[in-house]
Structures are given as C-alpha cells and as structure tokens.
Amino acid sequence: LKTDHAYLTERGLTPATVAEFGLGFCAKGTMSGRIVIPIHNKDGELVGYAGRWPGQPPEDRPKYKLPAGFRKSVEVFNLDRASKEEKGLPLIVVEGFFDVIKLWQQGFHRVVSIMGSSLSARQEEVLVEASAERSGIVLMFDEDNAGRAGREKALVRLARRMFVRVVPLPQEGAQP
C-alpha cells in the first residue's frame, strides 16, 4: 500500500499516524483506487478493511466500501487501541474512521467509531462493557441531520445504562 497518498496529506495526517493505523492507497484488487483502513476487533485481530474513495467519489461509486460479509454493526473501530488507554477517562464515540484518526493524532486516544450514525444493539453492548471502568461516554457525532438523529437515539439508549455526555459541534456540517 502506498502510504504517502495526497489524500492522507490533505486530511492533515502525519506519517506516524498513517503508520499507526496502517493506512494506505490500494492500487489493485477489490479496494482498488481507495484508501484502505484496517479494522480490528477489541482484541486487536484484523477482521476487515474499509476502503475510502479519496475525495468525492463518482456517482456510481460509494464513498466507503466494505468487504462482502463484513458486518460493521458488530464491531467498534479502534476499540483495541482505546481500551489500552487510561481507564478513568471517558470513551469518546464518533461516527467515522477519519474522525477517530484525526482525534487520535490530536492526543485523544480514548476514541472509537461506530462506523456510521446508527448505533447497533451489539455496538451498544460493546460500548457499555468497554466503558465500565471509565467515567462514561462522550458522544461527538457529525453536525448534520443523520448525525443529530443518530446521536439522539444513541443518547436515549446509552443513558439508561451509564453516564453520557454530548458534545455538539459548533456549526452545521461540522465533523470532529
């Protein structure tokens, strides 16, 4: 994989962050033409890859591509790294892969993604378990219609089980 792709640089990612997350541009195969993002389970085992089209994709291509059979509803991106961090601090939950990666690069290492704006029942269980030794969860979803709706649903479900804080972003369309 080519690790010095212009898209990664444009996103402001450092070579160290690109290496930490195993990011790279795929020139062949099912993820051809995409930035590849390895996805690990909570134990650090590789369970899949996401392919992100660099920039705005053509109309006939989705922005993200996941391998056939991969069920994102059962995984929480970056939980393997976030679980190793200091236990007393809250777990930050965001929507996207690059939200996690950018926050990680800025020093927020207790950050995970549900890989979309909709929290599944399985992801809810994983987050509750992962935050048992922390001071709750912080929801920081995109400031758009899907993000606000997903944040409200996640808040209602998670607040029954733990302390949840919400960090609304300052402007429409903003991402963490």
Please describe what each predicted stretch is:
Residues 114-120, 142-143, 169-171:
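Short, acidic/turn-prone active-site loops that include or flank metal/cofactor-
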Residues 128, 145-157:
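Mg2+-dependent endonuclease catalytic cores in nucleic-acid-processing enzymes, primarily RNase H-like
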Residues 93, 134-146:
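Acidic beta-strand-to-loop metal/phosphate-binding motif
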